[in-house]
Amino acid sequence: MAEYRLAMNAFESASWNCTSLILPEQPAPPAWLVRVETGLGKSHVGKAMIAAALKANPVLQIDYIVPGHELAEDVVADLAKLSVGAEVYRGYKQPDHRPGAPPEAKMCLDIAAYEDALKCGANVRQSICDLLGEWRCTLAGKCGREAQRLKRSRVWVYPSQTLYHKRPDFIPEADLLVADEKFIGGAVDSKVTEILLSDIAAVAGDYNGALVDILQESPGRRPLTRSTLVAKGVTADGARRMSKIELRRADVLVIQPGMAKTQRAAVVRDRGRSIKHARHMVDFWSEVAAFLDAGHEESGRIWIADSETFGFRPLKPVHDSWRTATLILDATAPSTELLSAVLGLHVEEKADIVAHWSPYVQTRQITGAQVGMRALGIRSDEKTGKSVIVDEGKRNRSDILRFIQARAGLIHGDVLVITYKTLVEEWEQAGGLPNNVRLAYFGNLSGLNDFENVAGLIVIGRLLPPVLEMEALAAVFSGTPVPESDRTWIERKDGTKRLGYAMVDGGILTASGAVVATKMFQHKNPTVEALRQLVTEAELIQAIGRARAHRRTRGATCRIDIVCDIPLPIVVDTVVPWDSVERGALGDMAGSGVWLNNRRDIEEAFARVSEYWARDAAKQMGRNPFKESILKRDFSPSGPASLVALPRRVTYQRAGERWHTNTAFALPHGPQDGATMREWLEDRLGPMAHVEVERLPMKHSALALAMAAKSW
């Protein structure tokens, strides 16, 4: 972590030079990106440096940005341990955490008024809280938002969405802003704003008339072009003037604090739509001006949807009121170009810090598994847009479930499984997972520290965002559509073509130095590719980072399975094909704590297992006898194996002359002595003539594992 500390010290010095004397001619404040591999403790070190800086500078004010409110609470708790007082900034609809507040209480006690203000696009505080000190909400004395305004702290912690709104006026300007993890997601609205012909025509003006003509003369859906605007006499300066005119029309207070609900409803009905349209037009004309200034021929943010509608999706950079020295800490940060566009400052990458993983972690990447969302039967519902599970893919889902069961049966301790949210929800509802399995899903991983002590981690699948969505997003960030030459068209079996990602050669790097060839997704356009990587590779790295592989010791080993073909910027110990891993009937047997080796005995002892899967399990067991078992293959005897509870070999013979001696394995959570093993076998297979459980050396036993965990 020495490199990280040096970067932090250098940033502190640079930011002090920026903030020590505030003069108009001073240069823009520094904005630094420090990439720190997940699990290295970047947040902990960053908070320690903040504590030291606050102690050294008694007037220093710091803003700390995290992805959400839950993580904000964790930051405040962590800073308290360092004797630093901090406050979480809470929005109107957030829970009120004040002592004595009802559990269901929100920060705002009149959410209906808040939502009415939003419908009008109004300034919320002036509309429903306090207007010039003369009109106040009748609930102000009990309100969590008003109580929050009285708080004072040198460190405020905010959810990242707050960056895209004006900074709270009651909090002193910050000298430093620390952004811990991603924040660019709030820069682009998920919904498209529609600018309707009827709303444009309702307001007089030459430029509005030009917009009406552009819509009515359009041959169909297409981007708004520079040549079209120039032909209609629209200039950048004229667009800026129109934005100011619309601002005067929009900046009208139509709702006041204390207004009755019926009055507000009438205002929303009569004036809300026109005022909100005016606010949209403020942004629309500002974007037209920026587009003409930029020199692009086609706009990536404004398009003609049809003869009566403009589609508009602006880039919302971080609000100017947050402009100060900024430090970005992120293991999977986007490119500095994207960060600069959103932050409004030139971002420099100052460090990219990686670390060696502990030798007490073994990583296996499993290729060739059918783990894409489509292969697993995960679809988007046409009506709701939500992901749902369909019958197609049932076989693949069953294979994955049985693999998890088999793997969890081999691991002494909790196993974290990370996969798609829809699949996690189905498993939570249907059950069937071993008791030592915990679940998490992609898209909800940043900053989570709940799983740093799991004994196993299984990452299944990968997110792959739709190409059209990523191209549309890239168009917003860059300001111009993706060129046709950057797109890849893939031919279907029926001869038609679909838009997709190119499949290019890639390689998975192993500890031996060998590279295992694989294929990887790639988009030709660098902005689209950067955005895709934030969803695919970055989320996989976040998932793997939950195991905190750098911090493992002899008493806290971990086995990581990555079940997908995507090459990642990590070194894995082994790469194996899906067909060779423990799964099928081994998963069905794992819950009982015993793996049988004989096909007929498997069928008899486990009613759910068919002849095909029983034969497959016997084949797997024959391929992986105890001396070369999956467990020993993962952990060499000279390494962490001495502290892993290995399966015990069991030899048994059923009563009667026609039965031969067979082999089984007692898993770490299964029967561990002759008496319980005999009972297990006789319950399922009938009387036994002979049962013998192998005695393991003390170093391989579960007891040794528990003792080691306490001593290290």
Task: Specify the residue positions occupied by each region the protein language model found.
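ASCE RecA-like P-loop NTPase motor cores
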Residues: M1-W712
